[in-house]
Amino acid sequence: MLTKKEIRRAVLKARSELDSETAALAYQVICRRILDIESYERAEDVCLYMPVNNEVDVMLLAEAAMEQGKRVWVPKVIKKGEKDQAGEMVFNRYEGMDRTVTGPYDIVESLSEEILEPGKNTLVIMPGVAFTWSRDRIGYGGGFYDRFLQENPQVDTIAVCYDLQVVDEIPVGESDMKPDYVVSETSIYR
């Protein structure tokens, strides 16, 4: 089995080579699929992420969610710690792109100071680098989503990816959290 580092390198390279037209078609399909998932339909709070480096663009869901009366939230890293402490991730209220700023890790964050209090009607839509169809996930190595989900087991989770991000097997550790769903342009796995 390849190491997480080797898998990250290979998948990130493949994702970076995905042309913008193919990516756009894929993430439009992925977002439409999410709209039909029960945990999205019942969610009052929808946590999205600001895509970077050719990630699936789930911000297409922001407008639809707000039109449906859902509150939309995006991640923010706080207390960026020392070398041995990665920091903490919270979700701030999303109020539109004109109310954002580039934060740590060059990720766009909301300027809102309102922080999500996750509940049973909270849905977290999360990125990742690589996945298996048994819902194992490799992120970027910071553990932000894993820690957030360990602290908030009541939330529903959907991970999104392109088919090219799916691999046969991933080494998993005790702290690695599986999403409830993995959604790609061709499949939904639960």
Predicted regions and their residues:
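N-terminal active-site beta-alpha-beta segment that forms phosphate/nucleotide-binding
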Residues: M1-K120
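Conserved phosphate- and dinucleotide-binding cores of soluble alpha/beta proteins
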Residues: G81-R190
